[in-house]
């Protein structure tokens, strides 16, 4: 009997690689990242753990590479878990961020993430089951703390997840958004900073992060902030957001504007 498959973007290192290791006991893997050699090494490791892996070497800032992953998501009925994890960050001052960096960041964190989320959503809706995990960031709800462009891209992914929740849920699809804080991965080095400059009590190890995110999924959380002590804070924030809903569109301005 064929095992279900999990497709993971950004699978060659950090969060994606750790998810692959954690899921290998239950899923075969489709591993997506730019670095084919790293993916081959990971696939060999996972094979020893009993999981077969398919490799898709792809730079997801390129539209044609995103299209290849879209086709895989929509054509392989064994795929039932999608980790939307590929992303880049920048620590430059927002106003000094280069056009090249902006375009690459938006292409990966927004355009590719959206296209793949929707492809998975279409595929899983047709099959009436499946799980999408969108890897956002804590700066999605606290954008003042980091580069505004990066924070904006992660806020977009959170909003996309929230907007899709009802449509997906009624078709048997689970969508979870994970909002990590600072996590010890290569994204910091690639962004041009040293994570050791951050207070150690602010930095989570990647294995702990992934364990918490998977536990949150098991608990039925649709938004998971691994470092947040009280989940009621998320529920309260969501309730406050939804409280605005009845008055967001009216035929006249509020009384204070008259």
What do these predicted regions represent?
Residues 10-13:
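Conserved glycine-rich cofactor-binding loop
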Residues 26-41:
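Conserved glycine-rich Rossmann-like NAD(P)H-binding loop of the short-chain dehydrogenase/reductase
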Residues 36-37, 57-68, 99:
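The beta1-alpha1 cofactor-binding region of Rossmann-like NAD(H)/NADP(H)-dependent oxidoreductases
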Residues 93-104:
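Substrate-binding pocket helix/loop in short-chain dehydrogenase/reductase
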Residues 117, 153:
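Active-site helix of classical SDR
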Residues 137:
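Residue(s) in the substrate-gating loop at a strand-loop-helix junction
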Residues 177, 193-233:
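C-terminal helical subdomain
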């Amino acid at each position: 009997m064929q095992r279900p498959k999990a497709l993971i973007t950004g699978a060659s290192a950090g969060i994606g690689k750790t998810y692959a290791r954690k899921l290998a006991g239950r899923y075969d893997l489709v591993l997506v990242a730019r670095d084919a050699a790293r993916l081959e090494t990971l696939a060999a490791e996972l094979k020893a753990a009993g999981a077969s892996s398919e490799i898709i070497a792809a730079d997801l800032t390129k539209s044609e590479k995103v299209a290849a992953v879209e086709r895989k998501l929509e054509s392989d009925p064994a795929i039932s878990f999608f980790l939307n994890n590929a992303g880049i960050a920048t620590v430059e001052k927002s106003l000094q961020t280069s056009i090249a960096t902006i375009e690459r960041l938006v292409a990966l964190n927004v355009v590719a993430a959206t296209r793949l989320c929707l492809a998975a959503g279409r595929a899983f809706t047709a099959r009436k089951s499946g799980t999408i995990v969108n890897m956002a960031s804590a700066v999605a709800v606290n954008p003042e703390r980091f580069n505004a462009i990066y924070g904006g891209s992660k806020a977009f992914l959170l909003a996309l997840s929230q907007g899709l929740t009802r449509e997906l849920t009624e078709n048997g699809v689970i969508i979870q958004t994970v909002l990590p804080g600072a996590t010890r991965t290569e994204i910091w080095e690639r962004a041009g900073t040293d994570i050791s400059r951050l207070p150690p009590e602010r930095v989570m190890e990647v294995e702990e992060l992934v364990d918490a995110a998977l536990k949150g999924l098991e608990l039925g959380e649709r938004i998971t902030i691994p470092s947040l002590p009280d989940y009621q804070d998320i529920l309260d924030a969501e309730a406050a957001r939804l409280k605005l809903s009845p008055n967001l569109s009216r035929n006249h301005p509020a009384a204070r504007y008259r």
